[in-house]
Swiss-Prot record:
Gene Ontology molecular-function annotations: DNA binding; DNA-directed DNA polymerase activity; metal ion binding; RNA-directed DNA polymerase activity; RNA-DNA hybrid ribonuclease activity
Organism: Hepatitis B virus genotype E (isolate Cote d'Ivoire/ABI-212/2003)
Domain Reverse transcriptase span(s) in chain numbering: 356-599
Span list, region Terminal protein domain (TP): 1-177
Comment block on domains: Terminal protein domain (TP) is hepadnavirus-specific. Spacer domain is highly variable and separates the TP and RT domains. Polymerase/reverse-transcriptase domain (RT) and ribonuclease H domain (RH) are similar to retrovirus reverse transcriptase/RNase H. The polymerase/reverse transcriptase (RT) and ribonuclease H (RH) domains are structured in five subdomains: finger, palm, thumb, connection and RNase H. Within the palm subdomain, the 'primer grip' region is thought to be involved in the positioning of the primer terminus for accommodating the incoming nucleotide. The RH domain stabilizes the association of RT with primer-template.
Origin organism lineage: Viruses, Riboviria, Pararnavirae, Artverviricota, Revtraviricetes
Name the record gives this protein: Protein P
A family per Pfam: DNA_pol_viral_N
Gene3D superfamilies: 3.30.70.270
Region (Spacer): 178-345
GO biological process: DNA replication; symbiont-mediated suppression of host innate immune response
Summary of activators and inhibitors of this protein: Activated by host HSP70 and HSP40 in vitro to be able to bind the epsilon loop of the pgRNA. Because deletion of the RNase H region renders the protein partly chaperone-independent, the chaperones may be needed indirectly to relieve occlusion of the RNA-binding site by this domain. Inhibited by several reverse-transcriptase inhibitors: Lamivudine, Adefovir and Entecavir.
Region annotated Polymerase/reverse transcriptase domain (RT), chain positions: 346-689
Encoding gene (name): P
UniProt keyword Hydrolase present: yes
Alphabetic keyword roster: DNA replication, DNA-binding, DNA-directed DNA polymerase, Endonuclease, Host-virus interaction, Hydrolase, Inhibition of host innate immune response by virus, Inhibition of host RLR pathway by virus, Magnesium, Metal-binding, Multifunctional enzyme, Nuclease, Nucleotidyltransferase, RNA-directed DNA polymerase, Transferase, Viral immunoevasion
């Protein structure tokens, strides 16, 4: 007969009328009982032949993600002119006096940030903008291109001008070496000259006038900065041949090559690969009058393209280098010919724009390393778009980068730190990631861009032929004309005006500030904000400032104090170049909303929207149907967040964890579902731990247990010998139930860790409820007053220790001096799930 929910509650000792704990609790450690209950609740995970369920409510498996919806009216968010003060350490020292070693180390990490991937795979430009919305290809192309342009204008991206130079807007940093020697002309004259050449994005651009002279005088490709990482000998010798192929799939990401060391004969010998590339490009871009390939020493090898006579009528007209402007002189092919649109304006503006500053960069191929697409800014704001950058190549495969770990405050530390009677407000840092500058050496690895409208459309429309490889004939200009394209462009013309022309050109951009799609970025942001908060706390001793990523909170004793504090801190942050969004400052009163929790003087609880999600999840959870383990991962993710607030905590979810580990489907029995549902219906706050003196001690041997409560000693025996960890856990439970003390001394590390997931399942669930809110202090066995009673010696009375307990705030503690993390030691901070062996999602 299946186990009823009421009976199951009685087994777990969750009901009031349970028998004496000393008799009932050891039974829960019995393997036979655990096995029988697991069978009754269908937790044995037999291989199921019924088809698995792949969707539960909003939860779907990892391989069936929700389809994003395209919004043609997305607004591109505006970015302030973010420029973090380069001398940020001195600025802070003027404000608070000398910084600690820890703060300096963290601030130095991001000024500038560096990125050294193991290998970089270059992708063709067509993959620059992902065809995420097949029904809105053109619209998505222009919206994304506009977003990239906005980022470039805000100084967040570099624009690749040539193989070795880039331009950007905004204020330069000292590590960005400006090009001189007449390499680029300044002001309007330069713009005039550039637009005369109609060069596009440096993909086929003319070499800078002085680049060849300059390269002879420069020792390294990044100047003095980069000489810290010299190339090893073998690499130096080979670098010429390695760097000859633009699209070599992998290459050493760091190192310096002396550009002046190679001679002109190298260029000649390498022109074969240039010719090949040039031929490919001729075919793809037939109308450029000049192609060149920059050899790795900065000289340009030029090939002049004579329009072939086979092109027919096209060769009779003057050849434009711009696909868009060619339509002006062509006969309309239909009512939907693009020439109608192009003839609407006399002046379409320049083919390309250049930034105010030009710098040298390491050799950067005309490729991208990640695709981009747009999505809603967040579930609550669908009016604005957000750019998603896919640099997942750095997190995959054999050459994946293992990103540095960093301390995330756990719930108890957070509650100890923030649960108080302070008034709170949270600050919103606008575009937090885009505050932290990247070294230009990272540019070749973090490239985004687009192939230009003509190739993008041609690739996506199956009926158009891009190229006739056999005969080398030019594609017909009007191949891309279609009703859909014409209508889309006409509508976009209202939005973008003459910028349509600029955006239809190919472009390659590299990140100048840290992008969101790389695992290094969250680490750097966390280091940066924690250092800044540390400085703020020392500058304002009566204030509590705390941050996690870009979420910064300030607490003070009174509302008036908080307001004056807010003004001072805001001014300080602005003086460092940190941009705050005053409209999004939230005043919380005495209950702070932070990291998904509501934290008040009573402790912490999950925020309301999470509780609603959990109720929703249980409402839609099917019974007696095998659920795909990937969906179980999603369910456990949600329930695991709120587990510390339930009676039985993480142990209650162990059957689900086990099914995920074994990659089996999981079937919820009505009783197990009812049990979980009840668990999550009543949530209990996690309270702040209080300091105190330990008066109660517990100890156990495999056969018996002993307690020391004040001057009283107690002992008992188990019916059968138990594993030592289980015996110690039982002793701690008896100590809590007998004395009611919230502070217990024990010599067992597993009990101290308060993770009861490795014990027999029923015992883990019951112990979690009995020991909820209990703090443990470590006492060495030799000094443990409960050691003698546990061995059956009641007459011997050891003196009670004075063991003070100080609640921990973990690595997040206010003045924690965290030493630098040596790379060869195991991680000190684990994101372990409650399992002993943390499972990694596949």
């Amino acid at each position: 007969m299946p186990l009823s929910y009421q009976h199951f509650r009685r087994i777990l000792l969750l009901d009031e009328e349970a028998g004496p704990l000393e008799e009932e609790l050891p039974r829960l450690a019995d393997e036979d009982l655990n096995r029988r209950v697991a069978e009754d609740l269908n937790l044995q995970l037999p291989n199921v032949s019924i088809p698995w369920t792949h969707k539960v409510g909003n939860f779907s498996g990892l391989y069936s993600s929700t389809i994003p919806v395209f919004n043609p009216h997305w607004k591109t968010p505006s970015f302030p002119d973010i420029h973090l003060h380069q001398d940020i350490i001195n600025k802070c020292e003027q404000f608070v006096g000398p910084l600690t070693v820890n703060e300096k180390r963290r601030l130095n990490l991001v000024m500038p940030a560096r990125f050294f991937p193991i290998s970089t795979k270059y992708l063709p430009l067509e993959k620059g903008i992902k065809p995420y919305y097949p029904d809105n290809v053109v619209n998505h192309y222009f919206q994304t291109r506009h977003y990239l342009h906005t980022l470039w204008k805000a100084g967040i991206l570099y624009k690749r001008e040539t193989t070795r130079s880039a331009s950007f807007c905004g204020s330069p940093y000292s590590w960005e070496q400006e090009l001189h020697h007449g390499a680029f002309l300044d002001g309007p004259s330069r713009m005039g000259e550039e637009s005369f050449h109609h060069q596009s994005s440096g993909i086929f651009s003319r070499p800078p006038v002085g680049s060849s002279i300059q390269s002879k005088h420069q020792k390294s490709r990044l100047g003095p900065q980069s000489q810290q990482r010299p190339l090893d000998r073998s690499q130096q010798g080979r670098s010429g041949s390695i760097r000859a192929g633009v699209h070599s799939p992998t290459r050493r990401p760091f190192g310096v090559e002396p550009s002046g060391s190679r001679h002109a004969k190298n260029i000649a010998s390498r022109s074969a690969s240039c010719l090949h590339q040039s031929a490919v490009r001729k075919a793809a871009y037939p109308n450029h009058s000049t192609f060149e390939r920059h050899s790795s020493s900065g000289h340009a090898v030029e090939f002049h393209n004579i329009p072939p006579s086979s092109a027919g009528s096209q060769s009779k007209r003057p050849v434009f280098s711009c696909w868009w402007l060619q339509f002006r002189n062509s006969e309309p092919c239909s009512d939907y010919c693009l020439s109608h649109l192009v003839n609407l304006l006399e002046d379409w503006g320049p083919c390309t724009e250049h930034g105010r500053h030009h710098i040298r960069i390491p050799r950067t191929p005309a490729r991208v390393t990640g695709g981009v697409f747009l999505v809603d800014k967040n579930p609550h704001n669908t009016a604005e778009s957000r750019l998603v950058v896919d640099f997942s190549q750095f997190s995959r495969g054999s050459s994946r980068v293992s990103w540095p770990k960093f301390a995330v405050p756990n719930l108890q530390s957070l509650t100890n730190l923030l649960s108080s009677n302070l008034s709170w407000l949270s600050l919103d840092v606008s575009a937090a990631f885009y505050h932290l500058p990247l070294h230009p050496a990272a540019m070749p690895h973090l490239l985004v861009g687009s192939s230009g409208l003509s190739r993008y459309v041609a690739r996506l429309s199956s009926n158009s032929r891009i190229i006739n490889h056999h005969y080398g004939t030019l594609p017909n200009l009007h191949d891309s004309c279609s009703r859909n394209l014409y209508v889309s462009l006409m509508l976009l013309f209202k939005t973008f005006g003459r910028k349509l022309h600029l955006y239809s050109h190919p472009i390659i951009m590299g990140f100048r500030k840290i992008p969101m799609g790389v695992g290094l970025s969250p680490f750097l942001l966390a280091q940066f904000t924690s250092a800044i908060c540390s400085v703020v706390r020392r500058a304002f001793p009566h204030c509590l400032a705390f941050s996690y990523m870009d979420d910064v909170v300030l607490g003070a004793k009174s509302v008036q104090h908080l307001e004056s504090l807010y003004t001072s801190v805001t001014n300080f942050l602005l003086s460092l170049g940190i941009h705050l969004n005053p409209n999004k400052t939230k005043r919380w009163g005495y209950s702070l909303n932070f990291m998904g929790y509501v934290i008040g003087s009573w402790g912490s609880l999950p925020q309301e929207h999470i509780r609603i999600k959990i109720k929703d999840c249980f409402r839609k959870l099917p019974v007696n149907r095998p659920i795909d383990w990937k969906v179980c991962q999603r369910i456990v993710g949600l329930l695991g967040f709120a587990a510390p607030f339930t009676q039985c905590g993480y142990p209650a979810l162990m059957p689900l964890y086990a099914c995920i580990q074994s990659k089996q489907a999981f079937t919820f029995s009505p009783t197990y579902k009812a049990f979980l549902c009840k668990q999550y219906l009543n949530l209990y706050p996690v309270a702040r731990q209080r300091p105190g003196l330990c008066q109660v001690f517990a100890d156990a041997t495999p056969t018996g247990w002993g307690l020391a409560i004040g001057h009283q000693r107690m002992r008992g025996t188990f019916v059968a010998p138990l594993p030592i960890h289980t015996a110690e856990l039982l002793a701690a439970c008896f100590a809590r139930s007998r004395s009611g003390a919230k502070l217990i001394g024990t010599d067992n590390s597993v009990v101290l860790s308060r993770k009861y997931t490795s014990f027999p399942w029923l015992l883990g669930c019951a112990a979690n409820w009995i020991l909820r809110g209990t703090s443990f202090v470590y006492v060495p066995s030799a000094l443990n007053p409960a050691d003698d009673p546990s061995r059956g010696r009641l007459g011997v009375c050891r003196p009670l220790l004075r063991l003070p307990f100080q609640p921990t705030t973990g690595r997040t503690s206010l003045y924690a001096v965290s030493p630098s993390v040596p790379s060869h030691l195991p991680d000190r901070v684990h994101f372990a799930s409650p399992l002993h062996v943390a499972w990694r999602p596949p």
